[in-house]
Each structure stands twice: as C-alpha cells, then as structure tokens.
C-alpha cells in the first residue's frame, strides 16, 4: 500500500473540494496517484469537474505592458516575496515586459534581447541581478498578443505597482469600433478571465486528452445504461463542461444572465462595429510550480541553534 501523507490529502482536497476522509480513501484506492484520485472521486460523485491547475507555490511577479495593437505579459520568479517587493526586481520585471513587445514573443527571443541602457542581454541582466540580490530568480515565460485593428486590453489582479501583480490577463479584441469603448469592454472581459480561469476560447480549443478524460468519467459514472442513452448523457455532459471552462460559453461575471459570447455580440452596436475576441492569456504567479515546504518554525530554530 502506498504511503499516503497529509500533504497529499491536502493537495487532493484543494483540487476537488472533497472531504478529508474521502480524499484519503481515494488516494488509498489509487495507490497515491493524485490525478487518478481526482478521477476516482468524480466517478463517485464526490468532486466537481476540475480545471487544469497546479499548485501555486512560487514567488515573484507577473508584469503586463501594452502599446496600441500589441501587448505582452511575462512572469519572473523569485524565491521569496520579500525579493518580489525589491525595487530592482520590480524594475527588471517591468522592463522585461516592455522589451517583449519588440520580440517574437518567445522566451528565447526575450532572453537574448538587448537590455536597454546596458551591454547585456535580458538573461545576462537577470544573472547580474541574482548576484546583486543573492537569491535565485527565473524568467519563466512570456506571451505576446497582437491585433490588426482593435485593442489589446489588460488587467492585473493584486497589483502592487503599475502593471505588476500576481495575476496578469491580456484580451485581444478585433474591431473597427470606438477604441475607448473597446478598451472598457476588454478590461471587463479581462477581469472575468482573472476570476474564472477558462482553459480555452471555445470547445475547439480544449485538448483531445481532456475531452477523452471527461468522456470516460461520464461513461463510468453511467455504466450499464443502453448505448444510445449513454451517448446522449456524454454529449450533454460535455456541453455542460464546455460551458464551465471555455471563455465564450461562460456566464459573464458582470451579468450572469448572458454568456461572454452574447456580450460580444451586443457590444457591436455600442462600439460601432462587430467585435471578435481573437485570443487571451492569463498568467497566475507560480501556476503549476511546486515548491518544497520548509521545516516548521520550531524545527527551523532548532536547526539554526545546532540541535537538529
């Protein structure tokens, strides 16, 4: 039997919202496999459909920079929140986002770009900052969005300084309508994305493995039903899943009576032209990164005193 730890139970509870004993039982049944335990709980009706989410444990900042028809978002990690509040670290994150506007939007392109006012590349500048501050840091990821006509709207949640925070969102709206009205609409949608964390724009963007996983869960939960009935249950279940996790089908957080798709359709008459949402990106600090938990306070003190 697998060794089931309290940390494993805690992680499963955070992912599913299921009770402690249910989580422990699921882990025992699946030999400690977290993802298999999620499915086991869902098949038993003990957990809701879970979006893809990793444990958020890294520190640092998400930085957003917009310039007309293009915008960029970057994530820079540090070991501690203390360093994330350092002026030099914040200046680096902000400048990295600005530099990303003039790159190809890839991480390598940003790392090798020239850092303004210095002889180094962005990567070399970060290494110099690490040497100065004395803590490991990482330029983790970057995304750039562009539109031909319209706006790239942005929103930063838990903002600690202009364009810097814990969650950064970009929304690309293609339209020939009024720019100010588009920007206001885009910001509302960006706030919606920050709150709901959709996995794709529409059903076509949900990866095949996820669709197969959802189908299998529905199939096992309804085992024994006639094939024609089961097919309808799976079809209905997937529609419900798409409404939960795809942006255009989600109920709009600012008006739950409408979907985001409906809001965009109605916006055309207000902004002076059809509006198409062509893309979005949501960065949550440390998304998917696991960090080792340190010793408790008493153990840490004992270690420092040489007694452990």
UniProtKB/Swiss-Prot annotation:
Subcellular locations according to the entry: Cytoplasm
Region Involved in Mg(2+) ion dislocation from EF-Tu, residue ranges: 80-83
Disulfide bridge partners, by residue number: none
Xref: InterPro entries: EF-Ts_dimer_sf, Transl_elong_EFTs/EF1B, Transl_elong_EFTs/EF1B_dimer, Transl_elong_Ts_CS, UBA-like_sf
GO cellular component annotations of the record: cytoplasm
GO molecular function: translation elongation factor activity
PROSITE patterns membership: EF_TS_2
UniProt keywords, alphabetically: Cytoplasm, Elongation factor, Protein biosynthesis
UniProt xrefs under Pfam families: EF_TS
Family: Belongs to the EF-Ts family.
Role description: Associates with the EF-Tu.GDP complex and induces the exchange of GDP to GTP. It remains bound to the aminoacyl-tRNA.EF-Tu.GTP complex up to the GTP hydrolysis stage on the ribosome.
Name under which the protein is recorded: Elongation factor Ts
Organism encoding this protein: Methylobacterium radiotolerans (strain ATCC 27329 / DSM 1819 / JCM 2831 / NBRC 15690 / NCIMB 10815 / 0-1)
Taxonomic lineage: Bacteria, Pseudomonadati, Pseudomonadota, Alphaproteobacteria, Hyphomicrobiales
Gene, per the UniProt record: tsf
